[in-house]
């Protein structure tokens, strides 16, 4: 399953996959992050969320990894999703890496997204985090992802941790 922007819902199209080829990202870290964002998008779509935008950017403000729509019976919710991946460390897991400063940047970018997409003004909004905690793995026969900058290292991918309502904002 591929994640493409839903052109019926988004007023400004974002071409993340040109001619079915991924964008050329400059660093191995960016390429790896893009793969985890793709996995998170597929994970959320399997749970019924609809992709509105992926890698939405506002210059000098910030980026939103995923913007999803969760349709409910009474109302729908616009979900701003931050995707984080971190290898096992003693400094905390992937979810903890979404600092207060990062939360402020995401909230600011979400405000700009809503200003540029007035069709979502009346929606409830929620800020979620999808966290992937990975470990280096020695068995090369198992399903894994190869690190771009370290071809002999492989990551063991755990199920994502989906933190719904991971943080809130006091007022829009």
Swiss-Prot record:
One of its GO terms (molecular function) is nucleic acid binding. InterPro entries: Restrct_endonuc-II-like, tRNA_endonuc-like_dom_sf, UPF0102_YraN-like. It comes from the Bacteria. Belongs to the UPF0102 family. This is UPF0102 protein Pcryo_2198. It comes from Psychrobacter cryohalolentis (strain ATCC BAA-1226 / DSM 17306 / VKM B-2378 / K5). The lineage of its organism: Bacteria, Pseudomonadati, Pseudomonadota, Gammaproteobacteria, Moraxellales.
């Amino acid at each position: 399953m591929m994640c493409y922007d839903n052109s019926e819902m988004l007023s400004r199209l974002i071409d993340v996959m040109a001619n079915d080829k991924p964008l050329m990202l400059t660093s191995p870290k960016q390429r790896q992050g893009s793969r985890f964002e793709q996995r998170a998008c597929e994970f959320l779509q399997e749970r019924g969320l609809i992709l509105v935008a992926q890698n939405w950017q506002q210059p000098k403000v910030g980026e939103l990894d995923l913007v999803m729509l969760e349709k409910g019976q009474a109302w729908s919710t616009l979900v701003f999703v931050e995707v984080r991946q971190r290898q096992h460390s003693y400094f905390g897991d992937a979810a903890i890496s979404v600092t207060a400063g990062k939360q402020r940047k995401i909230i600011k970018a979400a405000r700009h997204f809503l200003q540029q997409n007035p069709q979502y003004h009346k929606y409830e909004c929620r800020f979620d985090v999808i966290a992937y905690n990975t470990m280096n793995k020695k068995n090369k026969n198992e399903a894994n992802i190869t690190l771009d900058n370290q071809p002999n290292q492989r990551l063991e991918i755990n199920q994502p941790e989906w933190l719904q309502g991971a943080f809130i904002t006091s007022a829009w």
